[in-house]
Amino acid sequence: MEKAFDFLRENKDVAFGTVENNRPNLRVFQVMLIKGHTLYFATSPRKEVFRQLTENPSVEILGMKGNISVRMSGDIKFDVPVEIQKEIYATNTILSDLYPSFDAMVYCSLDVKAIDYYDLTPRPPLLEHYDL
């Protein structure tokens, strides 16, 4: 299971899926921080994704590189402590290029509830599923 989190530490760009009116919505997000089994993200409060998450916090993410893909799902929460917000802003330089200060964004966490780890390299392919 930890190899799935390690994979996302190395491959931070993920497809980030939300649901609105029973329809899927995808966009590319970057995993900003991982602590334990919690993933952290940041976005603008003006973006559609923020509104979607406040209306329905269920999300699924998918990261892929080569023959390996990792899918995780759970519910988003917006109660990220200020210390973690500042850490995210300080350690992800893309944010300071886009936003004037750490508090110009909203931060959210995903407490992962399910993981699928796929590796198509071995024969037969490896699929590991974890419910947390």
At which residue positions do the language-model features occur?
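A short, Trp-centered hydrophobic/proline-enriched beta-strand micro-motif
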Residues: 6-20, 59-63
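General beta-strand recognition
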Residues: 15, 38-40, 71, 116
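Conserved beta-strand in the GNAT
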Residues: 29-30, 71
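A short mixed-secondary-structure module that forms the rim of ligand-binding clefts
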Residues: 32-67
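Charged, gly/pro-rich active-site loop segments
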Residues: 71-132
